[in-house]
Amino acid sequence: MSHLRRRRFKLSLCALPVSIDRLLNFPAEKQMSVNDSIDPRFVFHVEDESLRFRVGDSGTKIRELETVGDRHFRTQQGFCGNRIEKDETMYSDGDDEEYDVSIRRRTALIQPGIDSGNNYDSAAAEETNRESKNPVGWELVVREDGEGNSTIDRHEMEFKVRITKPDGNVSNSHRNTQQKRDFASVEKERVTTTSVSSWESLKAILSDPVTGALMNDATILPCGHSFGAGGLKEVKKMKACFTCSQPTLEGSEKPNLSLRIVVHAFRQEEDSDHIHTLKRRKERSDQKRSFCIPNITETPKSSRGIQFPFSIGDHIIIEGNKRTPPRFVGRIAVIMTQCLNGWYVVKTVDNSESIKLQHCSLAKISDNSSTKVTVAEMPPSWL
């Protein structure tokens, strides 16, 4: 029995290449059969039509995955170097009247002269051809509402904006977004501009419409318009109001006391503000000067005290201290070298012996001759 089983297994193995050759050369339109001299043990039966594997089919394979939400991912792949990938993500806020923003990433690698073989309808093919002409990048689609309003936020990138109108027309435009400005600086600039404009408008109201000067001596006419001294002269010449051209009589004008009080208060406020501005400007300039320009008259900390009282070539007397050798005390020497931190190398006059001493151990020889004689007659300390 074992011998028969071995022989049957060998025959099956010999028939395997022939079966594989038939399988490869089998037409794609027909389903594989078990009765074509193929061992049933080497045949896999596919009952599901969607899971059928066909050899030699060069058509494109499309896999579509649809989720429950608003996202829809679609992948298209083809042979012969043609590849079209299109990932589309759509975001909706749930309101049909608001615009929908969809960001599409398009990637197209198409060889010229080769048909892509897509099996879509004419509208989808036209959209694919139109998108393949555009450069690879991000596309921001803004759909207008019924009233024709469309607004988009500014981002840090350059987008291609497609505005889809309700009638189906599509208009493309490039929009270079600006960088985000600091909110605090914008708010400060707006407050400053508002205050300046209100101040200027108030000054224009309190000024004479003829001369433009503040109406310190405001006078009101029967028509209700007020003028200063310069404007009142012009009104008397014309015998009519400069603003409304209403005729006026001589002596019909009266002083506008309330307007004079307001102008006086405005002038005081303007003067005080101007004085405060000058003071702040002066303080700021003084502060900059104190930080930038050092005071020349002030001695630095490193040079405080007398650290370098002598110069090279000066004649000095060695006074010495506790660490100075006794034989140098009281002798006349000459400054030879100036060192750091007030140290000097001195050389004695009588025997040219050098020693390094600090400035506090030295004293300058005065011009008094008696001092020189006393020093000259002083015997050496080492004798």
Swiss-Prot record:
Region of interest (Disordered), residue spans: 166-186
Record-given protein name: U-box domain-containing protein 63
EC number(s) from the headed UniProt entry: 2.3.2.27
Q: In which pathway does it act?
A: Protein modification; protein ubiquitination
Which Gene Ontology molecular-function terms are recorded? ubiquitin-protein transferase activity
Q: Where is the U-box domain?
A: 201-273
GO terms (BP aspect) = protein ubiquitination
Question: Which InterPro entries does the record associate with it?
Answer: Ubox_domain, Znf_RING/FYVE/PHD
> Sorted alphabetically, which keywords does the UniProt record give?
Transferase, Ubl conjugation pathway
Q: What does this protein do?
A: Functions as an E3 ubiquitin ligase.
Q: What reaction(s) does this enzyme catalyze?
A: S-ubiquitinyl-[E2 ubiquitin-conjugating enzyme]-L-cysteine + [acceptor protein]-L-lysine = [E2 ubiquitin-conjugating enzyme]-L-cysteine + N(6)-ubiquitinyl-[acceptor protein]-L-lysine
